[in-house]
């Protein structure tokens, strides 16, 4: 275990190198890691995130440092070691270090560094008195759904989807989901806490106190993020838990008794003010029919009525991304330059096994020869068994 105190990061002298014995993020094998030049780039109730440079490669990395309760295994570490996906931030290594107090132990997660977030990108367009270009909304939300389709097929629910947890490389347009600090493998008939997820993005069943919720809470959150990127502000800006429900009702209208039953049957007898829905095309005035249709299918009161992540990926809203001639304009610098879209269809066998009946919609014709050359011919495809796709913790 490292003797470096958490404060050591803040007192690094220029050019000073810290050496750690770390465990590899994939294999768990012990190896040496050296890094230098640390600066704090984020902190919260969980701990601190430092940006650092790995030595001698000079590669940027992020180190997330959290206080570890010795009585429990760290769920975030367990899940980060399981997930491997182009749209999920990669765990490079991890190690433990002592804190200021004798009994304090910190877990340090060494992850790839991604320079931007969707939250900051959205604020950039706000300052320019405009909203994010719709092609970028499509690009980011599609990649988020791709990450969710993958983790949901493993039984993992992220439980804190919000713009701040969506990392972005503005030069490539690649999105990576981060912060699995609230993530959990959901097991049927095992209760889960309802007080998770950041307020503006909380699914109504969570506000109703449900403990038997599903991965569809992440789908609701994604609908909220998508609408926010199109609006330039949160769709449901509640000031408290119950006010959050009021904001949702102002748009979706009062849920029916049946809808309330699907969220939490214990609330059946509550009397809610009767409010008519406010159509999405009036809330999102600039949105086209495909955008409106998708958001309406994501923001359903009844969890089972919401689209699954993989179903959302094949929605016509994302058809532009499947067109091989679509290019990504540089919206930040207004140079008039365009670039290729990042890889969006480099699916592996696991991803193609999630909903094999959708593969012909999922994989555009121009990509099929590339996948076939890797042994993934969607016309002659044997999917993995669902149980083999589920994540299992030690």
From Swiss-Prot:
Where it sits in the cell: the answer is: Cytoplasm
The Protein kinase domain sits at: 35-318
Q: Which EC class does it fall in?
A: transferase
Is-annotated flag, keyword ATP-binding?
yes
Recorded phenotype for the gene knockout or disruption: Leads to significant delay in mycelial growth, complete loss of conidiation and inability to penetrate the host surface by mycelia-formed appressorium-like structures, consequently resulting in loss of pathogenicity.
**Which InterPro entries is this protein grouped with?**
GSK-3, Kinase-like_dom_sf, Prot_kinase_dom, Protein_kinase_ATP_BS, Ser/Thr_kinase_AS, STKc_GSK3
Where are the annotated coiled coils located?
none
* Induction behaviour: Expression is regulated by MPS1 MAP kinase, particularly under stress conditions.
Question: What's the domain of life for this entry?
Answer: Eukaryota
* Reactions mediated catalytically: L-seryl-[protein] + ATP = O-phospho-L-seryl-[protein] + ADP + H(+)
**Gene Ontology biological-process annotations:** cell differentiation; positive regulation of developmental process; signal transduction
Record: residues binding ATP: 41-49, 64
Which molecular function GO terms apply here? ATP binding; protein serine/threonine kinase activity; protein serine/threonine/tyrosine kinase activity
Give GO cellular component annotations, separated by semicolons. cytoplasm; nucleus
Sorted alphabetically, which keywords does the UniProt record give? ATP-binding, Cytoplasm, Germination, Kinase, Nucleotide-binding, Serine/threonine-protein kinase, Stress response, Transferase, Virulence
Q: What is its EC number?
A: 2.7.11.1
Per the record, a Pfam family?
Pkinase
**Briefly, what is this protein's role?**
Protein kinase that acts downstream of the MPS1 MAPK cascade as a highly conservative signal modulator that dictates growth, conidiation and pathogenicity. Phosphorylates HAT1 at 'Ser-8' to block its translocation from the nucleus to the cytoplasm where HAT1 positively regulates appressorium development and pathogenicity.
The UniProt entry's sequence similarity note says: Belongs to the protein kinase superfamily. CMGC Ser/Thr protein kinase family. GSK-3 subfamily.
Q: What is this protein called?
A: Glycogen synthase kinase 1
Output the lineage of the source organism. Answer: Eukaryota, Fungi, Dikarya, Ascomycota, Pezizomycotina
């Amino acid at each position: 275990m490292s003797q470096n105190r958490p404060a050591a990061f803040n007192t690094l002298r220029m050019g000073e190198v810290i050496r750690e014995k770390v465990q590899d993020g994939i294999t768990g094998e012990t190896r040496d890691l050296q890094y230098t030049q640390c600066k704090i780039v984020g902190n919260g109730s969980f701990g601190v995130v430092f940006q650092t440079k790995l030595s001698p490669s000079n590669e940027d990395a992020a180190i997330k440092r959290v206080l570890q309760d010795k009585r429990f295994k760290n769920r975030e570490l367990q899940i980060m070691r399981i997930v491997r996906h182009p749209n999920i931030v990669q765990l490079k290594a991890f190690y433990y270090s002592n804190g200021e107090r004798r009994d304090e132990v910190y877990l340090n997660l060494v992850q790839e560094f991604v320079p931007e977030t969707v939250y900051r990108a959205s604020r950039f367009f706000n300052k320019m008195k405009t909203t994010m270009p719709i092609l970028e909304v499509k690009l980011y939300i599609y990649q988020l759904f791709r990450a969710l389709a993958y983790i949901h097929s493993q039984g993992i629910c992220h439980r804190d989807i919000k713009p701040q947890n969506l990392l972005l490389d503005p030069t490539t347009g690649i999105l990576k989901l981060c912060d699995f600090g609230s993530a959990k493998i959901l097991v049927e008939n095992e209760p889960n806490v309802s007080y998770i997820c950041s307020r503006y993005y909380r699914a109504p069943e969570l506000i109703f106190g449900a403990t038997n919720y599903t991965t569809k809470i992440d789908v609701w959150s994604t609908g909220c993020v998508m609408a926010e990127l199109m609006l330039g502000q949160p769709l449901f800006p509640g000031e408290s838990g119950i006010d959050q429900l009021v904001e949702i009702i102002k748009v979706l209208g009062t849920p029916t008794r049946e809808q309330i039953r699907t969220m939490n049957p214990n609330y059946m007898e509550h009397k809610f003010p009767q409010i008519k829905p406010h159509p999405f095309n009036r809330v999102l005035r600039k949105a086209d029919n495909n955008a409106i249709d998708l958001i309406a299918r994501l923001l359903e009161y009844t969890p089972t009525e919401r689209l699954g992540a993989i179903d959302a990926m094949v929605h016509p809203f994302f058809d532009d991304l499947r067109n091989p001639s679509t290019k990504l304009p540089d919206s930040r610098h207004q140079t008039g330059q365009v670039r290729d879209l990042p890889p969006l269809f480099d699916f592996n066998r696991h991803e193609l096994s999630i909903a094999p009946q959708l593969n012909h919609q999922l994989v555009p014709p121009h990509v099929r020869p590339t996948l076939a050359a890797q042994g993934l011919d969607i016309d002659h495809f044997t999917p993995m068994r669902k149980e083999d796709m589920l994540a299992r913790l030690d």
